[in-house]
């Protein structure tokens, strides 16, 4: 049996069309297009690629993007002052600071400085807290994108065993909260987890985000399980791969996301969905 591929690219396109239609509705009502401020500090090549793809997606959806490309020498205070200005600007709906940041800047201080209503990444403790108490406002992009993928493929987590491998603030923890919200029974695995293979083998829905190539072995996957691979790693050969052994897992799973073309496009599309939501909240 070979798993059905979950086509994140196609679902992301569909979501972008939906966002574009939402922008069109705003314009028809005489409102302005949503605006996203994107702040890049330094010249990390991977970050520059991510920022470029976000700008391109904004253009496609009719969202205005405002770029702040700052030198690597930017101080924390300078960055916080820029964020303060954007928080106060009624013409800006979303503020995104591309991570990682240079070592002189504390990322948590930066995340917490963003107005929670404009925190389109969904990283602010206020937004994570709201998700935890079943009152989501700005939902973290990757976990929300994963839930959209499941929905599109008719996969309902309710009553299922969801296993999350990785407990990062960006993916693992908020993903567990999203699954709880969808009424799954949730297990989170991390570096202190014993018998990882056993935990993975129990999963009806498996979400992996650890940043280690082929970390989860295909033979661990429960037959018929849904496998969502959030990892994206570049091997020495230049090839991209995920955190799950794809070929072996594909033979056992019911559904699986490829890398690339699975979760990645959903993260960007969800960012724009959040920006539109923010604009509509702020009227």
Curated annotation (Swiss-Prot):
SUPFAM superfamilies: Aminoacid dehydrogenase-like, N-terminal domain, NAD(P)-binding Rossmann-fold domains. GO terms for cellular component: cytosol. Disulfide bonds: none annotated. The keyword Oxidoreductase applies. PROSITE patterns: THF_DHG_CYH_1, THF_DHG_CYH_2. NADP(+) binds at residues 166-168, 191, 232. One of its GO terms (molecular function) is methylenetetrahydrofolate dehydrogenase (NADP+) activity. Pathway: One-carbon metabolism; tetrahydrofolate interconversion. GO terms for biological process: L-histidine biosynthetic process; methionine biosynthetic process; purine nucleotide biosynthetic process; tetrahydrofolate interconversion. Its EC number is 1.5.1.5, 3.5.4.9. InterPro entries: Aminoacid_DH-like_N_sf, NAD(P)-bd_dom_sf, THF_DH/CycHdrlase, THF_DH/CycHdrlase_cat_dom, THF_DH/CycHdrlase_CS, THF_DH/CycHdrlase_NAD-bd_dom. NCBIfam families: PRK10792.1 (NF008058), PRK14186.1 (NF010783). Belongs to the tetrahydrofolate dehydrogenase/cyclohydrolase family. HAMAP family: THF_DHG_CYH. This is Bifunctional protein FolD. The gene is folD.
